[in-house]
A protein has these predicted regions:
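Active-site recognition of the HExxH zinc-binding catalytic motif
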Residues: 149-163
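Hydrophobic or amphipathic, alpha-helical segments that drive membrane association/targeting
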Residues: 30-81
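Short pre-active-site segment immediately N-terminal to the catalytic Zn-binding motif
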Residues: 135-151, 171-172
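N-terminal signal-anchor transmembrane alpha helix of single-pass membrane proteins
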Residues: 13-36
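Auxiliary, metal-adjacent structural segments of Zn-dependent hydrolase domains
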Residues: 63-129, 140-145
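Hydrophobic (often cysteine-bearing) scaffold residues that line and stabilize catalytic clefts
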Residues: 91, 148, 173, 177
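Short, strongly hydrophobic alpha-helical membrane anchors
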Residues: 1-11
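Metalloprotease/metallohydrolase-associated module, dominated by Zn2+-dependent proteases
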Residues: 165-227
Length: 227
């Protein structure tokens, strides 16, 4: 009983917060500087069943009308993105380059750049065939491959809309869209862009996309085996 009273005396709110902070700091140091990986547990991202990825690949192989080569970002455009990653004119050129790869006229698409953080969103699209708008959420640090991956995802929404390729469930449709981006030649950019990246604060991290890097690799490997 005496031991219990002594222990309970240490279990104050401040002491608990201090202990949690120390544990968090140790976890961060081990993952960031020893294991060289982002200290974010995989449980932070919704697991995508391999069966669903297989279904999406099968659906695309059946319904896609074209075979796409790997997308290559023009050298001059990459340089401009590295120098001016939040420049609206540069980002519109990137959007048009991605659209051109997909056989879409990107000049008619209105691109809106926003620096106001929106939880759980890096981009969005609205279209009615006659008019299309893409929103791109931009906040530092700017990662070129992540910007490409987000825009590729939104353009893929438009492509799948034109082709009538979709899934009924909204979340599954987002997985289909990410899978299509890999399928249509953006695999390398999706893999790099969907990594967990350090955020604005020292201990903050960000990730875009609905699938993880291991999912991108699985899609690429599966497509490669089927060719």
């Amino acid at each position: 009983m005496e031991l219990l009273r002594k222990v309970s005396g240490y279990l104050t709110f401040d002491n608990i917060c201090t202990a949690l902070s120390v544990i968090g700091a140790v976890y961060f140091v081990i993952n960031r500087f020893i294991l060289h990986r982002a200290p974010v547990p995989s449980s932070a991202f919704k697991h995508v069943p391999k069966d669903l990825l297989d279904e999406c690949i099968k659906q695309l192989k059946k319904q896609e009308k074209r075979v796409y080569e790997d997308y290559e970002l023009p050298i001059a455009l990459r340089r401009d993105l590295q120098l001016r990653p939040d420049d609206e004119e540069v980002l519109k050129r990137l959007l048009c380059s991605i659209c051109d790869h997909m056989g879409i006229d990107g000049s008619f698409i209105k691109l809106i750049i926003s620096d106001t953080p929106v939880p759980e969103r890096a981009g969005a699209i609205s279209t009615d065939l006659a008019f299309t708008t893409i929103w791109l959420e931009m906040r530092p640090p700017y990662v070129t491959d992540s910007i490409i991956a987000v825009l590729a995802h939104e353009v893929m929404h438009l492509h799948l809309y034109y082709e009538g390729i979709r899934r009924q469930d909204n979340w599954e449709n987002e997985i289909l869209t990410d899978t299509a981006a890999v399928y249509c030649g953006f695999g390398d950019y999706m893999y790099k862009g969907y990594a967990v990246n350090q955020g604005e604060m020292a201990l903050s991290y960000r990730k875009v996309g609905y699938i993880r890097q291991e999912d991108v690799k699985y899609i690429l490997d599966t497509i490669g085996k089927q060719e």
